[in-house]
């Protein structure tokens, strides 16, 4: 139930934020995403802090797989402060089939998937040519993630991504790095990397 509520909050907030773009420049997604290259496991390198990931202290990953109905299955996992892993399953549908770079995601149960407000924008706004990293955002600029195929990213690449994101209207000052390779001991976080 908690996962449903957190997923519902994300989708509702993203839906509301898409109406509140204000004077931001129009956000553009990348010209093309090859879905079979995008599938698989991604490590969260950094993000805008958000309510539905508040319990996560590190080791955050997102795994995408193709479903028979053409949609994508999402599995987001993270380490919590108590040392347990939290997992949230979701689904994505392609919103722009010409580019595959604009998706709609939901973590709400399937039986309410007919409601438009349970689906949130998930746009690939930056992508390495070799698919070693991807940057996710949405038109309201309320959500932002940097994902990579490896748990660490060199600082030069990270800074270049932040500069490009800033030119798109995102705020680098809001971005927080996500620790990978961490453990928890008695409620504290120990970074092993």
Question: Across the structure, where does each feature detected by a protein language model lie?
Answer:
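A beta-rich soluble binding module of mature secreted/lumenal proteins
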Residues: 7, 16-193
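Positively charged n-region of N-terminal signal peptides that target proteins for export
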Residues: 1-4
